[in-house]
């Protein structure tokens, strides 16, 4: 099973069409294949433990389960992820399953308006010996079209968190151990090739015709 991360939808006006469009946009169109290009698990239950061994969610969804996270705050999501991590550490000594608790996405009301999504990563103190992970998450907003690549680069440690942010402006003086909001610093255009963008847009357009996106 491939490694994946959770998606929480807290937006109050996110219907199944928007969620399908979002999940298709954050698919790995550049390098993925049918069984590997979806890397995110949609979480709708607030009462059940976060499913660390759940398969990734594969759009299009035909129906949306009752979403208990609707209207929740980002702080509630962070608290749930931290609590799940503590449960796993206590039971096994380390987190089990492919689902990555150190990275997750949150689709909130602003995400519906401007087609961004909140990308969160567990805070880390690089100066501590050994490394420590403060109970908080660094976060920034990234466009839907950049979310997969940003997530992937962080997941495989190809790019550090601070490298993605704008140190010359609002983030000056911040540290990755802080667990605070950062300013997205990737000012390049979407990196998905034109060929694969056409494939993606064609799938979304087809689903629009079917009333599913």
Predicted regions and their residues:
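Acidic, proline/glycine-rich low-complexity IDRs
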Residues: 129-213
């Amino acid at each position: 099973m491939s490694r994946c991360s959770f998606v929480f939808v807290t937006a109050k006006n996110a219907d199944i069409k928007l969620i399908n469009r979002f999940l298709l946009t954050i698919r790995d169109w550049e390098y993925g294949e049918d069984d590997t290009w979806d890397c995110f698990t949609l979480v709708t239950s607030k009462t059940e433990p976060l499913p660390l061994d759940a398969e990734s969610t594969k759009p299009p969804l035909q129906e949306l389960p009752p979403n208990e996270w609707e209207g929740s705050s980002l702080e509630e999501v962070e608290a749930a992820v931290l609590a799940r991590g503590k449960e796993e550490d206590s039971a096994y000594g380390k987190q089990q399953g492919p689902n990555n608790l150190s990275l997750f996405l949150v689709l909130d009301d602003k995400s519906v308006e401007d087609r961004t999504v909140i990308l969160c990563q567990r805070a880390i103190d690089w100066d501590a010996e050994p490394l420590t992970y403060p109970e908080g998450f660094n976060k920034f907003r990234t466009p839907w079209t950049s979310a997969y690549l940003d997530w992937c680069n962080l997941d495989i440690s190809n790019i550090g968190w601070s490298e993605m942010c704008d140190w010359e402006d609002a983030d000056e003086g911040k540290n990755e151990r802080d667990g605070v909001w950062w300013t997205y610093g990737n000012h390049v255009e979407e990196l998905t090739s034109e060929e694969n963008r056409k494939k993606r847009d064609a799938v979304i357009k087809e689903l629009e015709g079917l009333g599913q996106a």
